A protein has these predicted regions:
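N-terminal targeting peptides and non-cytosolic leader segments immediately upstream
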Residues: 2-6
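Amphipathic, non-membrane alpha-helical rod segments
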Residues: 7-8, 136
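RNA-contacting regions in translation and RNA-metabolism proteins
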Residues: 12-13, 244
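Transmembrane hairpin
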Residues: 15-16, 28
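Well-ordered beta-sheet/strand-loop patches within structured domains
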Residues: 24-429
Length: 429
């Protein structure tokens, strides 16, 4: 098509060599010592003739001769003009002829907006927690433009004699997550729950904890899949709603966007721990924080340490969250499979006395030096042991060792100074 005019490119005959005949001549010539052969070629007509193209062009001229009115039920919803019809026309070779068709994506693009007000979005199935049990909330089919039906209706109206009017309709649109999908995952009842106290927290820290809990709420971990805290929660940035809190840097608490992330990670870790899930990655805080279970805390950082655990159950796990300004709770829902976890905490060992730390602050006044008092808490190591049983049989045992540093005073040097060493650098303000 050139605009609204079909352009016919004439066909032409070709030539073809009879390969079997040529091969026989070559063999005979070789046996008789003849230096060459004469091969004959035959004329071959094109599979698609100029006449076939002219016939298709005539049909195309009819198709673009006038607009096609569009109706949905009893509603006039618009029309397709000749230029639009021309842009949608396609010529498909079919048994020695050209079959006229309309591009399906083009039909969808042009017609879907015209019937959008009559369509309905599908609703995914979901879960509703009632006490310790889970109920499946049924999904619902939606409706959308019937593209195949619209193709046939518009093409028929455009190429056949009579009224140039096409009736278009809708077809069912299934949800991405159906009721059957939801039931098949085996998410039926609570299998673990864990709550941590916020401890002393600013309003920003509480906000961040609640925000991360909302990002995690409703996460489904299918059997054999691994949960990654950083992948699910994503980067902690102001653009995603996070506020400035605090993070541990060396022996100091410093301002940082997303402070409170470790509260969330610690609560999740303890759920995975109590359910006996394999923990693929976990890191303790550099300090011991008393409002977390000793040896069972978890710290994460975007682009750095992560918390990862694997669902080794026979069914999927649904994570649900609840919180107040003083507590955070995660609950895991699945199907119970006779699992029991027995844990014990070893003694504190390898005690370390606090020593001064030396930090460099590029934002401090030139030549400055100041000391920030630490808590003077001792450092130590501790190991938590875990045994996982299923139906009374031991299936796994593992341990988690934490190394907590001693927290001494911090001497902070500004530019133009000569510290004895630099243990860490404060972020520029």
């Amino acid at each position: 098509m050139k605009g609204t005019e079909p352009v016919v490119v004439a066909g032409r005959s070709g030539t073809r060599v009879d390969q079997a005949a040529v091969l026989a001549l070559v063999r005979d010539a070789a046996l008789r010592g003849v230096p060459g052969i004469e091969a004959h070629v035959a004329s071959v007509a094109p599979a698609l003739t100029t006449a076939a193209a002219e016939q298709a062009a005539a049909a195309a001229r009819t198709a673009v001769s006038a607009p096609v009115a569009l109706r949905f039920r009893h509603h006039d919803v618009g029309e397709l003009g000749p230029r639009t019809i021309a842009s949608l026309l396609r010529f498909q070779p079919q048994g020695g002829a050209f079959e006229l068709s309309l591009a399906p994506e083009g039909i969808r693009r042009e017609l879907a907006p015209l019937v959008e007000r009559f369509t309905r979005k599908p609703a995914d199935a979901s879960y509703r927690v009632v006490g310790k049990r889970v109920r499946v909330v049924k999904g619902r089919d939606g409706t959308m433009l019937d593209v195949a039906g619209a193709q046939a209706a518009v093409l028929g109206a455009a190429t056949e004699s009579g009224v140039r009017e096409a009736a278009i309709g809708l077809t069912a649109r299934e949800p991405k997550f159906s009721t059957q999908d939801a039931r098949a995952l085996g998410i039926r009842r609570r299998v673990s729950t864990f709550t941590t106290d916020m401890g002393p927290s600013s309003s920003n820290r509480i906000w961040n904890v609640h925000l991360m809990a909302d990002y995690i709420d409703g996460t489904i971990i299918k059997p054999g899949k691994t949960f990654s805290f950083n992948k699910v929660v994503g980067p902690r940035t102001p653009e995603r709603g996070f506020r400035e809190g605090q993070m541990i840097l060396g022996s100091l608490l410093v301002p940082a966007i997303g402070g409170g992330v470790c509260q969330t990670a610690t609560t999740l870790f303890n759920n995975a721990f109590e359910l006996g899930l394999p923990v693929k990655e976990r890191h303790n805080h550099s300090w011991y924080i008393s409002h977390y279970p000793i040896g069972r805390d978890a710290t994460v950082s975007w682009g750095g340490p992560d918390l990862q655990f694997k669902n080794d159950l026979d069914h999927a796990i649904l994570i649900k969250t609840s919180y107040t300004d003083s507590t955070l709770t995660f609950s895991f829902f699945s199907t119970k499979q006779g699992r029991k976890v027995v844990s014990s905490t070893g003694p504190q060992t390898n005690f370390r006395s606090p020593k001064p730390s030396y930090a460099y602050d590029p934002s401090a006044p030139k030549g400055s030096k100041r000391t920030v008092a630490g808590s003077h808490a001792q450092g130590f190591d501790i190991t938590v042991f875990r045994k996982v049983y299923e139906h009374g049989k031991l299936v796994r045992k593992d341990s988690f060792t934490s190394h907590y540093v001693a927290v001494g005073d911090t001497v902070i040097y500004g530019p133009g100074t000569d510290p004895p060493r630099i243990d860490f650098v404060l972020p520029s303000i």
